[in-house]
Amino acid sequence: GDIYSRHCPIVAGKVKECIHCSVCDTMCGFGGAGAFSDGKYNFTTQFGGWLTDFMDDDEVMSLINYVDTVNMKYGATDKTFSTDTPKARALEREALKYDLHLLQAKVKHLGTENNLRILQNMYEDLCKVIEYRFRTEVCGIDRDGEGYSLSLRQGENIKCRYLIVAPGRSGAEWFSEQCRKLGVKLINNQVDIGVRVELPATVFEHITDVVYESKLIYRTKQYGDKVRTFCMNPYGHVVAENVEGINTVNGHSYSDPALRSENTNFALLVSNRFTEPFDQPYRYGKHIASLSNMLSGGVLVQRFGDLVKGVRTNEHRLAQSYTRPTLTAAVPGDLSLALPKRQLDDIIEMIYALDKIAPGTANYDTLLYGAEVKFYSSRL
């Protein structure tokens, strides 16, 4: 729906856990999944997409800076964090001792509450020049002479000469099907699978106070797989999201200190790049996430110490944890029954590596939520 009619019943306090709405308002509508994110804006070409495949770094940075001016026009902050400071470089040197690589970036944190307000301001301006049609399902795309025809669920057909399709990650599988039908070759054989880590904010405070979000990459010794931290949220909250009926986990943080928690959360993701003949990474990721749902009815949570010992976390064991979960609807269980052994081994090794630069990361009561899955939109 439009930016004003998107309301998650969990956030509104009407229910305690996901009720599987037919359309997830957290993920779909004006602003997409970003509408309720905490608005991290990264100034870098080291990660965040593939634009550098088509233009040089200077051009990409010029576009990133342009988008920042648009964001500020609609209310974004001018405050930034950077890895290009003496304190950040000291963190980078310390991380390298343990084969952890800190990616270079300048970052702005808008905050969940401010991000929504900025998008509302954009929506008001765009309404003056664009006609929107919300809650209108496009069933199919067909060629129509030199243009295209869209078949809507209501039975209507819309014809156009030029068509821009941007269904986001929630519509990635649908988009792949449409491209296959149209004979358009796609590039996408990657999915990232992992967990969301939650621990006391003080454990990472010496890092988040300097760079806010640390993007750290580690190559595991056991398998040689790449594991990375992603979407770090100091004093944040862990949340569930619904991707086509599958509950996955995510996180966010507010700018307002009054809305903060005592914990920091971040994702640990293992990159999975598949080779021929396998070409269904999206379905693979959904299947992994569905195993967590099958075991817990939603998002699963486990203490790190229990995972290492091979013990299932239950309500009693979770109640003993000094780290209190911010996602109270998460169900205690055993991640080893849901995630593949290889990815789980990678995650455990990464946690021990992080513990060397942020002592306390590998504490028994560090909480792991699963599954977190990052889907990649297909590219032409």
Features from the language model and the residues they span:
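Mobile "lid/hinge" segments at catalytic clefts and subdomain interfaces of large enzymes
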Residues: 50, 61-64, 68, 276
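Conserved catalytic/binding loops enriched for acidic/polar residues
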Residues: 55, 65-68, 73-74
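Compact, glycine/acidic-enriched structural inserts
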Residues: 76-78
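Residues forming the flavin
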Residues: 1-55, 81, 86-380
